[in-house]
Amino acid sequence: MNSIPEGRPTPNLPRTANKRGVARLAAAQALYQMDVAGTGVMEVVAEYEAFRLGKEVDGTQYLDADPQWFRAIVAGVVEDQLKLDPMIHQALTEDWPLSRLDSTLRAILRAGAWELKARKDVPTAVIVSEYVDIAKAFYTEDEPKLVNAVLDRLALVIRGESRGAKPRHKS
């Protein structure tokens, strides 16, 4: 069952999620839309809140999301992108700059990085796990492992805690 209109990244396997989890997925999709279509933050947030979150689109029901969480992620990523992108770049291997990643993967990493930085009240393991699950919904290859490794490295840098990975390089 496809819950995203044509032309947008679509998850492979829908997963039962809480309202924050749905907000994270919607935020990644909105950030993707902004990146690919050049849509502004106010426009995309208004579109999702009016026509997508908890609504029926093309015969498919979107799950309810926490609209404040959704707004915070999207607006936070936009506001902090010039700080987040270099941090993500540092967490990637030298031969994989952020610009080489596709728009969906960049959106997932930016949202996860922002949440690690801005939402210290949310446990690192929850953030990393949620964004790995989002990556698994869109990818079947190594991308979820990449999301796990990058967010784990960022958690070490941002929060001083990690599940084992160390930053790969410094530039």
UniProtKB/Swiss-Prot annotation:
SUPFAM superfamilies noted in UniProt: NusB-like
Gene3D superfamilies the UniProt entry points to: NusB-like (1.10.940.10)
Entry's transmembrane regions: none
A GO-annotated cellular component: cytosol
GO biological process, one term: transcription antitermination
Pfam family name, one: NusB
Keywords associated with the record: RNA-binding, Transcription, Transcription antitermination, Transcription regulation
Role played: Involved in transcription antitermination. Required for transcription of ribosomal RNA (rRNA) genes. Binds specifically to the boxA antiterminator sequence of the ribosomal RNA (rrn) operons.
Family, similarity comment: Belongs to the NusB family.
HAMAP family the record matches: NusB
Name of this chain's protein: Transcription antitermination protein NusB
Originating species: Brucella suis (strain ATCC 23445 / NCTC 10510)
The encoding gene: nusB
